[in-house]
């Protein structure tokens, strides 16, 4: 009891190491490419870097410059370290998450000690999730426009879903377990 979060974080660890992450989705619909300021001791260390009008910033791989993360035509990077106009360093938020969860402390062996689920089974379940999400994707040839005004020629569905009910949230660390489940999705 109470070790569900460790199990879920181990799945995330395995998927990151297997490079089974839907980066296109993360770039399109999340703050994964938004730059996070890395300036130890500064008031805004750990906050999103923003432009003059409050827009979130990213590193555009096309222009090799800092850009508004919301603009159509921008190709945001999700990993790397970049220099802001004021000379400070920033990294995409996905980079911070990947750095944390790729650590061996979140691996299958570490989770097996806390959960009672073998490392072999954790890896197998992660592989099954990856297979369902990437090898059995559903593609609909339907044109649509996303939230940023970018035209899409197809819709991709990944047949993996989870729903956290009261059981998880009833535990003292339930909020963090639910958060981990949503990161996994």
Q: Language-model segments: which ranges?
A:
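A glycine-rich, hydrophobic/aromatic-adjacent loop/helix-cap motif
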Residues: 103, 109, 125-185
């Amino acid at each position: 009891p109470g070790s569900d979060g460790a199990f879920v974080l181990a799945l995330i660890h395995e998927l990151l190491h297997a490079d089974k992450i839907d980066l296109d989705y993360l770039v399109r619909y999340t703050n994964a490419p938004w730059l996070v300021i890395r300036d130890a001791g500064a008031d805004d260390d750990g906050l999103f870097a923003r432009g003059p009008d409050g827009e979130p910033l990213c590193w555009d791989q096309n222009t090799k410059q800092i850009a508004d993360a919301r603009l159509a035509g921008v190709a945001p990077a999700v990993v790397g370290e970049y220099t802001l106009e004021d000379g400070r360093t920033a990294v995409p938020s996905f980079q911070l998450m990947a750095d944390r969860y790729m650590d061996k402390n979140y691996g299958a062996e570490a989770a097996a000690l806390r959960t009672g689920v073998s490392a072999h089974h954790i890896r197998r379940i992660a592989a099954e999730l990856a297979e369902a999400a990437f090898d059995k994707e559903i593609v609909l040839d339907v044109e649509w426009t996303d939230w940023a005004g970018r035209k899409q020629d197809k819709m991709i569905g990944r047949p993996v879903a989870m729903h956290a009910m009261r059981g998880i949230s009833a535990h003292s660390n339930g909020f963090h377990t639910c958060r981990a489940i949503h990161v996994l999705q």
